[in-house]
């Protein structure tokens, strides 16, 4: 998400979270406005924040980024969640929280994405117990998210952790019944991305509206 009008329209659909990709290699990358001066930090395009609704939480997605870059974007974009989609360790999460809490973002939450292909991949959740506030189970692939591919959700039956999670990985408009049939006590939501886009970073509002209406 980066187009102000699209952000406002999607925010009005009653969603809970909205993601912003801060990985430079992604076609969905959200850039900042350069200050053109090394001693002055870059800033956000204020238009992106104008359509924000109070009940929509902002999620910044990062991939093995430097902590100072994450902190800057948390502050500039007023992020509620940081989603780590690379090989970030539990120690890195703890250090990031220590930097952000309490002065910069006292209520910040950390989501750790785990790439899933088989049951053993799910077991990695134990590395983040007591560190991540939420997990996101995505499809393991050569790319970093946004593949449009799904994994076998039945492997999540083996997840016996106490960290709530989001279900991700190629969920599309035709998956309404499959999503409604999926049950797990720790699943708190689903992640909708590439299957609801007209182009990278631009969501098809009507497709989203129809899907959300059917799910709820």
Task: Identify the role of each PLM range.
Residues 1-216:
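Conserved N-terminal beta1-alpha1 strand-loop-helix module at the mouth
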């Amino acid at each position: 998400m980066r187009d102000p009008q699209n952000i406002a329209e999607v925010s009005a659909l009653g969603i809970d979270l909205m993601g912003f990709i801060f990985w430079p290699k992604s076609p969905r990358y959200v850039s900042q406005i350069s200050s053109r001066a090394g001693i002055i930090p870059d800033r956000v395009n204020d238009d992106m924040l104008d359509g924000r609704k109070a009940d929509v939480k902002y999620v910044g997605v990062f991939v093995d980024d430097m902590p100072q870059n994450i902190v800057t974007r948390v502050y500039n974009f007023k992020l509620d969640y940081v989603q780590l989609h690379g090989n970030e360790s539990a120690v890195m999460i703890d250090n990031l929280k220590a930097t952000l809490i309490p002065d910069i973002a006292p209520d910040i939450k950390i989501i750790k994405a785990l790439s899933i292909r088989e049951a053993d991949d799910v077991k990695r959740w134990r590395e983040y117990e007591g560190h991540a506030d939420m997990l996101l189970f995505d499809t393991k692939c050569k790319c970093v998210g946004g593949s449009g591919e799904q994994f076998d959700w039945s492997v999540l039956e083996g997840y016996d952790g106490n960290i709530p999670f989001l279900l991700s990985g190629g969920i599309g408009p035709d998956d309404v019944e499959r999503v409604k049939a999926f049950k797990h006590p720790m699943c708190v939501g689903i992640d909708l991305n590439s299957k609801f886009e007209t182009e990278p970073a631009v969501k098809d509002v009507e497709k989203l509206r129809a899907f959300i209406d059917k799910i709820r």
